[in-house]
Curated annotation (Swiss-Prot):
3',5'-cyclic AMP binds at G88, E89, I90, A91, R98, S99, R138. Homodimer. It is an enzyme of class 2 (transferase). Autoinhibited and allosterically activated by 3,5-cyclic adenosine monophosphate (cAMP). An extensive conformational rearrangement relieves this autoinhibition by means of a substrate-mimicking lid that covers the protein-substrate binding surface. Keywords: Acyltransferase, Magnesium, Metal-binding, Transferase. This is Acetyltransferase Pat. Residues 156-318 form the N-acetyltransferase domain. It holds the Pfam family cNMP_binding. Its EC number is 2.3.1.-. InterPro entries: Acyl_CoA_acyltransferase, cNMP-bd_CS, cNMP-bd_dom, cNMP-bd_dom_sf, Env_Response_Regulators, GNAT_dom, RmlC-like_jellyroll.
Length: 333
């Protein structure tokens, strides 16, 4: 018995260090530790294959793997699974065939479990919600971005936010000036790492974000965050990089956000901003905004989510945005 307890304790310690279990008390991992089995794989080994039935999941302790998804258009999208990550959970959550092929890049160790272990893991406090969020983020990476052509001919892309956008925004070459950040966050201080993490870690249901990119760099984003007391209301916010301001991106994004909101059951948009944020006020005024003063220099408003007929978007663009929004919002039930 002592040997079994010691083995389980070692597994609990290893599991507790993984991202998916961050913040979970060790005692909550005991049942899971008893239901998973050790995994060791050589470089180049296929662990999961796209299209196959889902019967297990993997937790990576060391090493890395390539995650490859081939879309209906035949284009392969490649990602990487690193230590601390879980793979194989999407198909189990959706009760569907595998959505990607996972191949080890180097020798890999970890843990594997079946449906029983997965059920145990989902019921660990906080883990189920984290798995749903992670699954939606991964599925969002498989969505093809929507080409967007601005009035001046600039070609950009629209897509849902992805986890790596925080690093791409912070370390990219696109500049967001102090004035732009002040208007967005209503503070002269640079956004903290914790806030930047929150802004990029979304679930696409209660917190949805569109990102506009130029190449691989995010140049603008628009988000809605659902009200905790009234799920039909969501607060919206926009950020556009300095070099891209005044080119119609904000007007386009409120249209894209409105389409996604209607898919998600949001009926009204709330906005809170600095009173001198004229570009955003102008956009909101087009949809009947009535402003209230909340504090010195801060105003608020509430508008109905604009319908397709009110948006400055073509029918084809609305349909594309609707399809992509539905893909990520309804990705995991």
């Amino acid at each position: 018995m002592d040997g079994i307890a010691e083995l389980t304790g070692a597994r609990v310690e290893d599991l507790a260090g993984m991202d998916v279990f961050q913040g979970c008390p060790a005692e909550g991992l005991v049942s899971l530790a008893a239901s998973v089995q050790p995994l060791r794989a050589a470089a180049g080994q296929v662990l999961l294959r796209q299209g196959e039935p889902a019967v297990s999941f993997l937790l990576i302790s060391s090493g890395s793997a390539e995650v490859s998804h081939v879309g209906d258009d035949g284009v392969a999208i490649i990602a990487r699974a690193l230590p601390g990550m879980i793979v194989g959970e999407i198909a189990l959550l959706r009760d569907s065939p595998r959505s990607a092929t996972v191949t080890t890049i180097e020798p890999l160790t970890g843990w594997t479990g079946g449906r029983g272990a997965f059920a145990t893991m989902v019921h660990i406090p906080g883990v189920g919600e984290r798995l749903l969020r992670t699954a939606r983020q991964r599925l969002a990476a498989f969505v093809s971005p929507i080409p967007v052509r601005l009035a001046d001919g600039t070609q950009l892309m629209l897509r849902p936010v992805l986890p790596g956008d925080r690093e791409r925004t912070v370390h990219g070459h696109i500049q967001f000036s102090g004035e732009t950040l002040y208007r967005r966050f209503m503070s002269a201080r640079v956004p903290s790492p914790a806030l930047m993490h929150y802004l990029s870690e979304v679930d696409y249901v209660d917190h949805f974000v569109w990102v506009v990119t130029d190449g691989s760099d995010p140049v603008a984003d628009a988000r809605f965050v659902r009200d905790e007391t009234d799920p039909t209301v969501a607060e919206i916010a926009f950020t556009v990089a300095d070099a891209y301001q005044g080119r119609g991106i904000g007007s386009f994004l409120i249209g894209a956000l409105s389409v996604a909101a209607r898919v998600d059951g949001v009926e009204r948009f709330a906005a809170r901003m600095l009173s001198d944020n004229v570009p955003m006020r102008t956009i909101m005024d087009r949809y009947g905004a009535v402003w209230q003063r909340e504090d010195v220099g801060v105003i608020t408003t509430m508008i109905d989510v604009p319908g397709p007929g009110e948006l400055s978007l073509g029918r084809e663009m609305v349909d594309q945005i609707n399809r992509v929004a539905r893909q990520v919002i309804e990705a995991v039930g």
